[in-house]
């Protein structure tokens, strides 16, 4: 685990020293002094425009020319246009610095910031750099019996010196709690599905949330059946592992404060059921529960901070498997709301799980708004790729606040349309609703959203976040390795705490 230390006096024992320069390549007094201390190494690096231009995210590591002391490298980092810096961009710089230092095998890093960088105070700037580096330090190696040399090395520490360290520490401690919640979400998402059965996943939720003061109720199939959740049970009926409904209630606000409900799709593994998926990349269906993991992670983040909000989270944990008892295309299920649903495609299972879970949370908790998070459709990935998650909502203000929160933490949302024409496409000939649209290949993410919308009560503000394209990545990003991204934790935490 990367150690982030805020110190009261500058140290010369770090192997690497971070230097920030914007695209204007101008030196302030402190940078001039540092350059002189290193015999003009920084200015010489800048003079070589082919080597360093100060562009945002450009990082050049040069060996120190000082023979005495521990500093062996200067890590020169481009800020680009400092006026265009955002919190998200600064965090990404922290992640990039850690990645470059790891490649260069620099085990300890020092950072000194004593003055504002554009609108950011030294305390805010350094806490964001530290947060980005901490997020980027995540690894999932628990099942590797041997590690490659490149995997063995990890940066040990970043030592930060600035004035008013107590303020910087306070800011970073909150960001670290949020990052640790992201790590839980990444961990449980990366976990192989033979390990994270619905029962095991539910136990892990209990283990991490109950010590934080969150009331957790794990509901088994007998009680799920008594609740009338035929849609959820239908998805899981082909699996040997019992489906679970996990209800998490965090009461950090007053009795008079309204409740926000978070609902997550928790399909532990999705074969597609009888409507079998292609075998290529089916292993990635371990991530089909990433929506539920985002919900759990957001509640961890809020509860660990003792945030003064009231939040309830509900996740339906199921496996969509084949067997002699599996749900068939053409089956009709009765949902908890009493509406009947025709299952035309067993691989459109997530919306069936969500239909019962969003209805349950409205019936029991009467929330101010409901936000569901799900890796719901491949269609959203076709539309938005891995840059944006899709946001569907019946309330413009809610959608705008979610999008704004996402921008601030670099978890982007794109507003997608709801329309009566899409709703008409999911009418069934023999039931109240069909689980896919009646025009093959058309508006798949929109018809899926409308399916969920059929189970939202009048007067309830609702947003549906389709995170299928952003939940996991085949490539490393500035803030983490390939695999589970942990998308949604920081977005939901930011929205609930600051925009609610």
Swiss-Prot record:
Cofactor, how bound (note): Binds 2 manganese ions per subunit.
Pfam families to which the protein is assigned, alphabetical: Peptidase_M17, Peptidase_M17_N
Binding residue positions for Mn(2+) 1: 270, 347, 349
Location of the protein in the cell: Cytoplasm
EC number assigned by the record: 3.4.11.1, 3.4.11.10
Single GO term (MF): metalloaminopeptidase activity
Entry-linked PANTHER family: CYTOSOL AMINOPEPTIDASE, LEUCINE AMINOPEPTIDASE-RELATED
Described purpose of this protein according to its UniProt entry: Presumably involved in the processing and regular turnover of intracellular proteins. Catalyzes the removal of unsubstituted N-terminal amino acids from various peptides.
UniProt record similarity statement: Belongs to the peptidase M17 family.
Name of the molecule in the record: Probable cytosol aminopeptidase
Source organism of the structure: Rickettsia typhi (strain ATCC VR-144 / Wilmington)
């Amino acid at each position: 685990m990367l150690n982030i230390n805020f110190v009261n006096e500058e140290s010369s024992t770090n192997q690497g020293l971070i230097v920030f320069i914007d695209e204007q390549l101008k030196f302030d007094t402190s940078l001039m002094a540092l350059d002189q201390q290193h015999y003009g190494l920084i200015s010489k690096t800048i003079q070589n425009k082919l080597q360093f231009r100060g562009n945002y995210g450009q990082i050049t590591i040069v060996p120190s020319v000082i023979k005495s002391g521990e500093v062996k490298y200067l890590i020169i980092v481009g800020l680009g246009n400092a006026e265009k810096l955002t919190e998200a961009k600064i965090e990404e710089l922290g992640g990039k610095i850690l990645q470059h230092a790891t490649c260069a095998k620099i085990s300890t890093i020092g950072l000194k910031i004593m003055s504002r960088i554009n609108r950011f105070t030294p305390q805010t700037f350094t806490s964001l750099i530290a947060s980005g580096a901490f997020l980027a330090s995540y690894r999932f190696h628990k099942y590797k019996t041997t590690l490659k040399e490149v995997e063995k090395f990890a940066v040990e520490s970043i030592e930060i010196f600035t004035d008013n360290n107590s303020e910087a520490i306070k800011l970073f401690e909150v960001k670290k709690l949020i990052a640790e919640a992201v790590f839980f979400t990444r961990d449980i998402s990366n976990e192989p599905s033979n390990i994270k059965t619905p029962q095991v996943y539910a136990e892990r939720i209990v283990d991490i949330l109950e010590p934080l003061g969150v009331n957790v109720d794990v509901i088994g199939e007998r009680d799920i059946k008594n609740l009338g959740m035929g849609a959820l049970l239908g998805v899981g009926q082909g699996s040997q592992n019992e489906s679970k409904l996990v209800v998490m209630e965090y009461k950090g606000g007053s009795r008079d404060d309204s409740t926000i409900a978070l609902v997550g799709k928790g399909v532990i593994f999705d074969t597609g059921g009888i409507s079998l998926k292609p075998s290529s990349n089916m292993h990635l269906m371990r991530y089909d529960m990433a929506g539920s993991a985002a919900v759990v992670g957001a509640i961890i983040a809020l509860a660990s901070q003792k945030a003064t909000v009231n939040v309830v989270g509900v996740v339906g944990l199921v496996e969509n498997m084949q067997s002699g008892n599996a749900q068939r295309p053409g089956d009709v299920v009765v949902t908890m709301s009493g509406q009947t649903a025709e299952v035309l495609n067993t691989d459109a299972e997530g919306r069936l799980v969500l239909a019962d879970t969003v209805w349950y949370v409205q019936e029991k908790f009467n929330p101010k708004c409901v936000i569901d998070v799900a890796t719901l459709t491949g269609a959203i990935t076709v539309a938005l790729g891995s840059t944006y998650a899709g946001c569907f909502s019946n309330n413009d203000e809610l959608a705008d606040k979610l999008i704004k929160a996402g921008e601030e933490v670099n978890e982007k949302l794109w507003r997608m349309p709801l329309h009566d024409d899409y709703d008409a496409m999911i009418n069934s000939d023999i039931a109240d609703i069909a689980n896919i649209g009646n025009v093959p290949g058309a508006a798949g993410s929109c018809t899926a959203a409308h399916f969920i919308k059929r189970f939202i009560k009048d007067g309830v503000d609702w947003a549906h976040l389709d995170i299928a394209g952003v939940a996991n990545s085949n490539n490393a990003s500035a803030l983490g390795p390939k695999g589970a991204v942990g998308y949604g934790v920081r977005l939901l935490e930011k929205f609930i705490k600051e925009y609610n």
